[in-house]
Amino acid sequence: MMDYIASHGLDIFTTVLGLVYILLEYRASIWLWLVGIIMPALDVWLYWSHGLYGDAGMAVYYTIAGIYGYAVWKYGKKHNQKEKEELPITYMKKSLYLPTLLFFLAAWGITYYILITFTNSTVPLQDSFTNALSFVGLWALARKYIEQWFFWIIVDAVCFYLYIVKGIPFKAGLYGLYVIIVVAGYFKWKKMMIKKS
């Protein structure tokens, strides 16, 4: 038992951080970004050691994006936002739909190419898909768009499967739980958005 725990120590620790992160995201707390810097920095090694090179690269991006997300939530502004008001939860502008889709498709294609050309990944299609959609999801989260939850339910469901296949059981369990929390998070943010308007 202790050997099992020792061999999955990083998986367990980052899973605990992941629970803290999703609960902070659910509450729309700016502190999610601090955890969102630490957890993915540790995940780089976890994913790399399990051959999930795309996810390792994504974890580097998450670490950097955590700094960006904090700055946007702390100092960012939206149209009609009052001075000193916290960045509000809003809908994504329809004019962003097509560029977002095109960015997702380009990121998926580029990441897929990198994985099949430069790594021995056994799941390049799924790994690149979750990476590309995570780029979009994290950007939408940083802008506090309510649609970010839709991106994450897809990412989390696919990652749940990937982590089971790759033998990362605690992360798999975390992502299974994320699927449930994401649904609740959407309704929580929607309620918060209505209350503020």
Residue ranges of model-derived segments:
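Polytopic alpha-helical membrane-helix bundles and their juxtamembrane interface segments
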Residues: 1-28, 32, 39, 76-81, ...
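Gly/Ser/Thr-rich helix-start
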Residues: 19, 37, 52, 67
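Helix-loop junctions on the outward
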Residues: 28-31, 43-61
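Core segments of alpha-helical transmembrane spans in multipass integral membrane proteins
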Residues: 34, 59-67, 129-132
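Membrane-water interface of transmembrane alpha-helices
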Residues: 61-80
